[in-house]
Amino acid sequence: MQYSFTEKKRIRKSFAKRSIVHQVPFLLATQLESFSTFLQADVPTAQRKSEGLQAAFTSVFPIVSHNGFARLEFVSYALSSPAFNIKECQQRGLTYCSALRAKVRLVLLDKESPSKSVVKEVKEQEVYMGEIPLMTPTGSFVINGTERVIVSQLHRSPGVFFEHDKGKTHSSGKLLFSARIIPYRGSWLDFEFDPKDVLYFRVDRRRKMPVTILLKAIGLTPEQILANFFVFDNFTLMDEGAQMEFVPERLRGEVARFDITDREGKVIVQKDKRINAKHIRDLEAAKTKYISVPEDYLLGRVLAKNVVDGDTGEVIANANDEITEGVLEKLREAKIKEIQTLYTNDLDQGPYISSTLRVDETVDKTAARIAIYRMMRPGEPPTEEAVEALFNRLFYSEDAYDLSKVGRMKFNRRVGRDEITGPMTLQDDDILATIKILVELRNGKGEVDDIDHLGNRRVRCVGELAENQFRAGLVRVERAVKERLGQAESENLMPHDLINSKPISSAIREFFGSSQLSQFMDQTNPLSEITHKRRVSALGPGGLTRERAGFEVRDVHPTHYGRVCPIETPEGPNIGLINSLALYAHLNEYGFLETPYRKVVDSKVTDQIDYLSAIEEGRYMIAQANAAIGDDGALVDELVSSREAGETMMVTPDRIQYMDVAPSQIVSVAASLIPFLEHDDANRALMGSNMQRQAVPCLRPEKPVVGTGIERTVAVDSGTTVQALRGGVVDYVDAGRIVIRVNDDEAVAGEVGVDIYNLIKYTRSNQNTNINQRPIVKMGDKVSRGDVLADGASTDLGELALGQNMLIAFMPWNGYNFEDSILISERVVADDRYTSIHIEELNVVARDTKLGPEEITRDISNLAEVQLGRLDESGIVYIGAEVEAGDVLVGKVTPKGETQLTPEEKLLRAIFGEKASDVKDTSLRVPSGMSGTVIDVQVFTREGIQRDKRAQQIIDDELKRYRLDLNDQLRIVEGDAFQRLARMLVGKVANGGPKKLAKGTKIDQAYLEDLDHYHWFDIRLADDEAAVQLEAIKNSIEEKRHQFDLAFEEKRKKLTQGDELPPGVLKMVKVYLAVKRRLQPGDKMAGRHGNKGVVSKIVPVEDMPYMADGRPADVVLNPLGVPSRMNVGQVLEVHLGWAAKGLGWRIGEMLARQTKIEELRVFLTKIYNESGRAEDLESFSDDEILELAKNLREGVPFATPVFDGATEEEMSKMLDLAFPDDIAEQLDMNPSKNQVRLYDGRTGEPFERRVTVGYMHYLKLHHLVDDKMHARSTGPYSLVTQQPLGGKAQFGGQRFGEMEVWALEAYGASYVLQEMLTVKSDDVTGRTKVYENLVKGDHVIDAGMPESFNVLVKEIRSLGIDIDLDRN
C-alpha cells in the first residue's frame, strides 16, 4: 500500500471491514466540470460542442434583418486572460472575470439581384460581448471582492407527467387525472379531466377548453379524432334487427340483453345472464362470426364515421351522433347496410373523447385556432395571420419553444418510443400520444408518475444556469440588432456598431450578484465551504417556494439512496428543500443524479463499477454494501438484504445484479464525518451534520482521535491545504513560502523547474474567521505530487480538524450541567485550546464632496495627541497597534458648509489664517464592543492622485516580496544549469580561457570551483559540439533572466497604476483587526452527534473531578442528555477515544524508556493489524517508525467509517491493549475498562459510582457570546415613533413589550411603569429634561406625552375622525 509523505507521519487505524473498491470522487467535481463545459475555454474553436456559451450563440445567431437583406452570423468566441488574479480581485473589491469577445460576420445581400441570394459584401470583426466571471480552482466565484457560490438547483425535469388529484378536488372523492407537458422553455400544456369525464386542455394555466379544439387545430377531423381513440363495432342492418361482428374480448363480463344464439339458432347465452369465459369458448367453438341483435340494441350507440347517402351525397348522420329511431329510419330509407359505432363500456373503454366532442362547438381547423387565439389574447381581433402566427409560435417555433435534449428523451421514454432523440419542438403525434396515455389512465390502465422520484427531477448546475442567463442577455441584444440591421448598408455600419454588450453584461451581473442561487459563500471552516458547493436547492427561479412546498416534496424518497443525503438538510422552513449531494453521487449528461454500483455476475461481485440513474436502478436487484463476501468474491449468505424498485427484501444471491460500492454511499460529506453515525437518531445526526459546519477554527487545530477516515479527503479537496503540484525536494521553507526544486522527470522542457507556494497568512474569511496556512515540511524533504505541504485553517497534518479532543466525564456537577449546559475546566482556557482568531475588516473612503475633497490626514483639530498616538504621518494606524473601542484607526476630515462666524473668530482667522472650523472629524474608529490588533492595512488611491507615504511603502513591500520569489526561481534555475554545465565541462579539452588556461589542458573540478560561475562561459573548448552546448546554456540563462525582469516590470506596472474605485471616491483605506476570542460562559459548543450546549461555568482545575492518578476532567457533561435523544454514538466515541489516548500514553511511555525500535514495531503492528483494515508497517524504515511513534504519543487516531465501524469486541480489545491490568487497577476501572473512579476536586472524596470517562472531539461553534452581548445607555431613535431602535447592529435597546408591562402592572410598580413608557422610551421632551435634571443634581422626572400617542392621533385623523386632547 502506498502512503503519501504526510500519511506516513500519522496513520489512522481503520476499523473498516471492507476494502476500498471505488475511491471517493473529487468532491468539487460537479461545480468545476459544469462550469468548464459552459466556457469550453481550453477547447479549440473547431472542436467545441454545442453546449454552454457555444450553444447560446448558435441558438440566437444568425440574426436576419426584417427585410432579409442583411444578416449577422456568429463565427467563434474567445476569452481573454483576467486582468487581476484572484487575490488582487479580493483586495480591490473587483470581480474575477474574463472579457468575452465574439468573432461575428456581417453579410449584406444585393437588393438588386432577382434571386435574393447574391452576397454583396462581408465584414468580419471581433466584438466585445461583456465580462464572464471565472470560477476559482476551488469552485467559487469572486464577485465584487467577495467569494460567492452558485448552488445547484433541483427542478422538475422537462418532459410529460401524468398525475391525479388524489380525490381532493371533487366531493365524491373521484380521481381526476391530468397530464402536463413541461418544456425547458416555452408554454406549458396541461390536459385534465373534469368530474363529468370531459377532457380539457389549458395553455400556461389559462382558462380550460375542450381538448378536441386542440386536436381540430392541429388538423384532425372529428372522424380522425374518433378513429385515434376508439375501436369500432361493425353492424350490418337487416330487415329486422341487425348482425353484429363477433369480437370475443368485447363481450366478456357484459350482461346479455337478449338470447345469444349460434348459427343453427341454438341458444348459448340466455337473456339477463352475465357472459363468462365458458360462453365465449362455446361461441368460438361454434365458429360464430356474427351475432344477431335486436334493433333496440343499436339505439344509444354512437356513430364512428359520417354516414353519406351514396346516391345524393347528402350527409345522413355525422360522426359522433347518437343512433336514434329517426336515424335508423333514415339509414334504411337510404338503403345503407354497413355502419360502424364506437365500442365503449363502463369498465375499461370510456366514451371520454366522444363526450368531449359534444361539448366542443368549433366546426373546423380555422374555428379551433381562432378559439385558442381568443383564449390566449382576449379582446384582440383575430386576423388570419395573427391566429396562424400565434398558434405556430406556441409549440412549433424553435425560438419560443424548446423541449431540450432531456425533455425529448423523457417524453419519448414516457410515451413508450424506442428512440430518445427527436425534434426539440412539440409535434402533432406528441400531443396525440399524451392524450392517448391520459385516456388509458382514466380507463384504469397504467400508472401515474411520482413527481418526487429523482428520475423526474434533474439538477441544473452552475454552467446551465449561467448559460440560461447569457442566452436571455443575447436575446435582448438580438432585438436591438434586428432593428439596426436594416440600416447596416446605408450607414456603412460595422458589426461592433450593431452589437451593444450592455444587456449581456447586466444579465450576467444580475445573476452572479443577486440571484437567489448565487449565495455568499459559507467559509467558517473547510467543511462548510465544501458542503456549500455540494448543496442542491429546490428553491430559486423556476423552482418551488417555501410556502407552497408540501410534505411530499420535502420527504426522503427511496430514489435518494446514494444520490441525495437523507440526513443533511437545514432545520426550519427549508427542511427537505435544501439537500446535500451524497458522497459518490455524480451527474449524467442529462443532469440526472447517478450513483455507482459494483456489478454482480453469477453471485460473484466484480470490480466493474456502473453508474446508474434513479430510473435505471429500479430495474435491478441491488445488494447492500455490508453483504458478506468470500475470498473469491462470491456472496456467502443464503439470503442477502437487497433493494428492488425502492423496496427492501431478503433474496438469494443468484438474483443479485448489483451491489453498493461503500456503506457510506448514502450519506453526504458532513454526515460521513460523524463516527458511529449508525448508533445515532437521524434527527440528532442532522443537527450534528449542520453544527460541524459552524465549528470555528481553533488556534491550534487538533485531529479528531476518533474519525471516520474521510477527514483527509475533505481537507485536501476543499483546497484549504497546499498540495504539491509536482514532486521534488523542498529547497526552502519559512512561515510564508515553500520553494520546491522539481524532479527532473516531472519538469517540462523550457519551463522553470521550480514551484513556489506563497502561503495565505492571517486572511479574513467571509465569516470573519481566520484563514492561515502553516508549512508541515522541512528543508530537504522529498515530496511527490499531491502531497500536503501546508495545513490550512482547521486542518492538522492534512486532515480535517474542526475541534479539540477533550477528556469528558458524564456526570452531574452541582446543577451546572442542567439542560445541556457544559462545565469546562479552566485549564482548557489557559492552554488556549478553544481560542480562535477572528479578523474584522474596517473601511473608510475619502470622497469628493460638493464642498471639497475629504482628506485622510493625521492633522485633526480637537483630538488629543494620545488619540493620534497610533497613527503614522499619513494618518493611518500602524500595523501591530493594539486598539480598543473608540480608538482612531484612520484620521479623516470632511469639509463642512460655511457657518456664521463670531467677530472673535473673524479676528483669529485674520491673524492666524485659522481654518480648522471648516472641517469636521469623520475618522474611522473602532466600533463599540471590539478590540484587537491591527494586522494589515491596504490603501487604494484613484489614478491621478498623489500617493501618500504609507501607500508607497505598501507597494514597495509587495514588490520586494515578488522580487524574492523571482530571485529564488532564478537561483534554482541557474544552479541547475551550472550543475549541468560542470558535468559537461569536466574532462573536456580547452583551447584557452580565463586565469591563463593553457591550450590543450583538460578542465577539472578544482579549476571550475576557483572560477566565478559566469566566467565558465569564457572557456574556449576544443570540441565544437560542446562549445555549441555551452553557448546554448548561456543563452537560456540570459533568456530566463530577461523573462524574470519582464515579469517584475509587469507586476510593478500593475501595482503602480491607479486603482479602480467607485465614482466619487478618491482614496480607500482598509484596516484589518485580529480579535482573539477565548472560550467563556455563554459560548455554544457541540459534539458531532447533535449534542449541543452552552458553557455555563469555567471551573478552576483544582475543583474539577479527577482520577486516581490526579488527571482532572476537561469537560463535564450531563448524562441525561443521552438516553432521551438517542444519540448513543457519543458514548461509543468517548469509549474509543479513551482507548486511543491510552494507546498513545503507552507509546509515549515506551519512547520515554527508549525502547528498542523492534519492540515499538511489534506494539504498533498489534494496534494496527489485529483487526479492521491492515496497514503495511513492514515497508517503514526504522526512522519512519520512530517518527510515526512520536506523532502517536497524543493518541492513536482511529477511523470508524459510517455503517462499517468498530464493533464492541474491537473496542474492548483496544481498551485492554491501552490499559493493562496494573493501570486499570491503579485507576480503579470497571472490568470493561470504560468507567473510572473519580474524586471530587473540592473535597477529595471519591464519587459513589464509577463514571464514564473518555475523549470526545468537541467543537466551539460560531455563536459566540461576544457577538451577541450588547448594552445601551442612550443611542439612536426611530424616526417616526421616536422609540429606541432594536438590535445590536443598530446599537438598539431592549424592547419592553406588552407582557412586560403586565408584569409591572401585577407588581403595582406604577412609577417604574411610567418611566418605562415615557422618558425611557419615546417622550422626547421628557428624556432631555431628565438629562438636564441629572446634570443639575435634581433627581425628578417630568413625564410628558409619548410620541407614539401622537402617531396614533395622526393615524386616526387620517381615517377622517377628528380627535383632540382635552388638557387639564
Curated annotation (Swiss-Prot):
This is DNA-directed RNA polymerase subunit beta. PANTHER family: DNA-DIRECTED RNA POLYMERASE I SUBUNIT 2 (PTHR20856). Pfam families: RNA_pol_Rpb2_1, RNA_pol_Rpb2_2, RNA_pol_Rpb2_3, RNA_pol_Rpb2_45, RNA_pol_Rpb2_6, RNA_pol_Rpb2_7. Belongs to the RNA polymerase beta chain family. It comes from Burkholderia mallei (strain SAVP1). The RNAP catalytic core consists of 2 alpha, 1 beta, 1 beta' and 1 omega subunit. When a sigma factor is associated with the core the holoenzyme is formed, which can initiate transcription. GO terms for molecular function: DNA binding; DNA-directed RNA polymerase activity; ribonucleoside binding. The keyword Transferase applies. Keywords: DNA-directed RNA polymerase, Nucleotidyltransferase, Transcription, Transferase. HAMAP family: RNApol_bact_RpoB (MF_01321).
